[in-house]
Amino acid sequence: MRRIVAGKLHGIYVTDANLNYHGSITLDPDHCEEAGILPMEFVEIWNKNSGARISTYVILGERGSRCCILNGAAARTCQPGDQIIICNSIYIRESELPDIRPRVLTFDSDNRVLDRLEYIVKFDDFGRYRFAIERARSLNHASIAGEPKTVA
């Protein structure tokens, strides 16, 4: 099994840092659902301002708030206004790689979604990997395995 990117919140801005909370990162459920990030799921966080890299788990904040709050020890690594990348992952067999389409959301400075992208890996006629980034289809969540669900 290989660890593969499942979804990303790319360039989201930290809205608060709460050192006295028990830990985690608090995120808007709308962003999580669209990127396929689950509550209590462990995520990697990469701070574009400082280069800090940490791992923590997700808790859900207020829907529609566009929040991104680092809690507990994680609050020491990211400050309000920092731009970060949040990534979840899955373990799959290499043969399943062409079957997934990780969802990537990009953000403006107010944490509104700017773009919805999908990472795509296919094999060419010679069995070599080919990677592409495409605008996402109209999905209600990231497709981890099998066909994505289409929003009616």
Curated annotation (Swiss-Prot):
Substrate binds at residues 56, 72-74. Pathway: Cofactor biosynthesis; (R)-pantothenate biosynthesis; beta-alanine from L-aspartate: step 1/1. Coiled coil: none annotated. The keyword Metal-binding does not apply. InterPro entries: Asp_de-COase-like_dom_sf, Asp_decarbox. It is found in: Cytoplasm. Signal peptide: none annotated. It is an enzyme of class 4 (lyase). The active site is at 24 (schiff-base intermediate with substrate), 57 (proton donor). GO terms for molecular function: aspartate 1-decarboxylase activity. Its cofactor is pyruvate. It catalyses: L-aspartate + H(+) = beta-alanine + CO2. Its EC number is 4.1.1.11. Disulfide bonds: none annotated. One of its GO terms (biological process) is pantothenate biosynthetic process. It holds the Pfam family Asp_decarbox. Binds 1 pyruvoyl group covalently per subunit. The keyword Cytoplasm applies. Keywords: Autocatalytic cleavage, Cytoplasm, Decarboxylase, Lyase, Pantothenate biosynthesis, Pyruvate, Schiff base, Zymogen. Is synthesized initially as an inactive proenzyme, which is activated by self-cleavage at a specific serine bond to produce a beta-subunit with a hydroxyl group at its C-terminus and an alpha-subunit with a pyruvoyl group at its N-terminus. GO terms for cellular component: cytosol. NCBIfam families: panD. Catalyzes the pyruvoyl-dependent decarboxylation of aspartate to produce beta-alanine. Belongs to the PanD family. Heterooctamer of four alpha and four beta subunits. This is Aspartate 1-decarboxylase. It comes from Methylobacterium nodulans (strain LMG 21967 / CNCM I-2342 / ORS 2060). The gene is panD.
